[in-house]
Swiss-Prot record:
Name of the featured protein: 3-isopropylmalate dehydratase large subunit
Source organism superkingdom: Archaea
Pathway info: Amino-acid biosynthesis; L-leucine biosynthesis; L-leucine from 3-methyl-2-oxobutanoate: step 2/4
UniProt remark on cofactor binding: Binds 1 [4Fe-4S] cluster per subunit.
One of the GO biological process terms: L-leucine biosynthetic process
Cofactor needs: [4Fe-4S] cluster
CDD domains the record matches: IPMI
Catalysed reactions, semicolon-separated: (2R,3S)-3-isopropylmalate = (2S)-2-isopropylmalate
Keyword Isomerase: no
Role: Catalyzes the isomerization between 2-isopropylmalate and 3-isopropylmalate, via the formation of 2-isopropylmaleate.
Assigned keywords, A-Z: 4Fe-4S, Amino-acid biosynthesis, Branched-chain amino acid biosynthesis, Iron, Iron-sulfur, Leucine biosynthesis, Lyase, Metal-binding
Amino acid sequence: MSQGTLYDKVWDQHKVTTLPNGQDQLFVGLHLIHEVTSPQAFGMIKERGLEVARPDLTHATVDHIVPTANQDRPYSDDAAETMMAELEENVRDAGIQFSDPTTGDQGIVHVIGPEQGITQPGKTIVCGDSHTSTHGAFGALAFGIGTSQIRDVLATQTIAMEKQKVRKIEVTGELDEGVEAKDIILEIIRRLGTEGGVGYVYEYAGETIENLDMEGRMSICNMSIEGGARAGYVNPDETTYEWLEETDYFQEHPEKFEELKPYWESIRSDEDAEYDDVVEIDAGELDPVVTWGTTPGQGIGIDDPIPEPEDLADDKVDTARRAQKHMRVEPGETMEGYDIDVAFLGSCTNARLPDLRRAARIVKGREVADDVRAFVVPGSQRVQRAAEEEGLKDIFEEAGFEWRNAGCSMCLGMNEDQLEGDEACASSSNRNFVGRQGSKDGRTVLMNPRMVAAAAITGEVSDVRDLKEVTLA
């Protein structure tokens, strides 16, 4: 097993005891909750006459079901209104801080935690959402959990888990223009597979990772689960510290920053740390990556041919055939020129301010293609305000994009933003499963934000490197 890694250090520091079944009971430093996975858990503890153990270490928001076009209450969707009302009641009764739309701090849970400064290195963080691994970008151990585990954390502020192995993914090389963090993680998943990380936590390291901004690191850690890993993380460094120092929490508590920084530095993986596996990726060889199929692992470079199913591993042949039939693609073709109907720029993977800035540089002075629905959904109200102050909203709207309010939106079919029929969508989100965006016949092509912008302008999957970027004022 691994030794001397950040994962080992933080795990051991938070271990309360080892249970008879061999699992470790861990103290949870931050519990993030939202409206979809928490109601049943609250109901369970109420039935037992229990209270929330640590409301001060619990933070709530609404993101999955919240409409992005019109957020006036009551919501037009009765189910969404019911979930929102239940969450409001539960957090009020328990005294839990709630970033709801009236606060100006609402947004996707994996966007608001970091931007408010409550996501910190060395914390154990859980949330009833599979993309909780996003917070690992800060050197936290962050895990998605199910309803029964949410119940346990609400009641005890602890969780029972099995310790995983650690795989170091060393990424080197300078990224080509138009290639982003999203392309790195799509390539990792393509190479290792959607089940390649089962039993592992991924440590992302190497000069390429170190040169990424925090938003890029979050994009990579966000999709660890798509690669089968239980979590993913990056060792904290000066980029991390500079980002955190500007957040509300540390602006209000500067003494805490100075107090915690030595601890953050101490949890970094040792130079001689031992890993269970090491994988090397040369990111300098990457082109923009897009998916051709119905799993995030079915990706190719924009210039590469769609594979022949028979050339894949035996257990992937039938899946590839079904995916190609659903997506209406043929082996040997490239994805460049694939017609799209919708362009979605949003999600907890790619809806932060730098994502929107990069996309705006492609969009500025251009127009969305005829017959394409294109919209931008900022990851949080803070991102939304900042983007509007910078003039990004105007750039997108002048090009023909819809500018929406913060929420999960079309990343998943749980709100009003959904594909219709067999529409094809260029999406900056994290999953392209059949039916993921609301229609069982819908087709999703995952790509980085600038590639989404390029697809919106051209009406087809295009190589963003062929479009000149415009300098923003």
